[in-house]
Amino acid sequence: MDPESFGLDKTAIEICNSYMPVLDIEPRLIREGFKSLYDIQKKHISKTKQYQLNKENGDSLMDVHFFYPSGYEQNPVDHKYKAIFYIHGGGFMVDGIKKLPREISDRTNSILIYPDYGLTPEFKYPLGLKQCYQLFTDIMNGNFNPFNDLINDSISIVGESSGGNFALSLPLMLKLNNSTFFKKISKVLVYYPITDCNFETPSYNRFSEKFYLTKEGMKWCWNHYTNNDSERDEITCCPLKATIDQLKDFPETLVITAETDVLSSEGEQFGLKLSNANVKVSVLRILKTIHGFVSLDQTNDSIACRVGMDLSMNFLNNISNNSIINENNNKTLLKLL
């Protein structure tokens, strides 16, 4: 099965054909290769503040980036913004590309909070997630508002790929700990999230190789992320393993998947499980595209990326997506599950 047979656009096909799994390279060297994509100041307003992690979460300083929407500098000094807590992807081991958080901040007129959480294998499960949890709770209780411009009475959580795993696990962790902040999460948005470690799903078997993200590549990421197999039974490691009761009262959620992605089945299964728990959830599969289609710079101008971004920004902005879903031009591009 080849990428060409799925009607992928030229750029997506080039990504699939040029990408080679790097299973024999140290994670730190992979990070070096991505450094050119990390210029967070490029074309956007951002500030960075160091945040002190507790001893049990690394006992170190973590950089937290704050992305600001266009027009921020023209607003009064005391103007406050709603907040979005954004968790980047990268297979648990690579820093995220900054294109997506920039656009989300701009199109929602929000301050987007972007933690540089500890990456595996130096910070294995659950350290990165616990760092995000500590930061999130300190933002919500007012202990970390370094520029005094955040509204923290409610917040949305957004994550992509492995960051989507964290974005789904964080509310579950809050609920398990009986945190009052669980109820303050207004929405959860995840793009092609990792929700499980089952490598025999329909999408894993159908798109196991040749489609950018591979089955062997994901096994490699998981082996670096967890300390042992028993951790993979925990719902904050594999959210799909949460029971219906554990998912009750989960925040309103939008799950966006990519058709030719090994992760599409597990993301959609998680959405179905939320629905079975009577959670308000929408699951949208974007057809003819690959994993990473909204976050990769190369696919930014693709129809799939633009439709995916329009759908997700409407969701965060409380605008109906019916018109996009019903447009004739999009009927061959997306599937509502």
Curated annotation (Swiss-Prot):
Origin superkingdom: Eukaryota
Hydrolase is among the record's keywords: yes
Alphabetical keyword list: Hydrolase
Short motif Involved in the stabilization of the negatively charged intermediate by the formation of the oxyanion hole, span: 88-90
Active site: 161, 261, 291
Organism: Dictyostelium discoideum (Social amoeba)
Lineage per the UniProt record: Eukaryota, Amoebozoa, Evosea, Eumycetozoa, Dictyostelia
InterPro entries: AB_hydrolase_3, AB_hydrolase_fold, GDXG_lipolytic_enzyme
Keyword ATP-binding: no
Induction pattern: By cycloheximide.
GO molecular-function terms, A-Z: hydrolase activity
Gene Ontology CC: one annotated term: phagocytic vesicle
The protein, known as: Vegetative-specific protein H5
Similarity comment text for this entry: Belongs to the 'GDXG' lipolytic enzyme family.
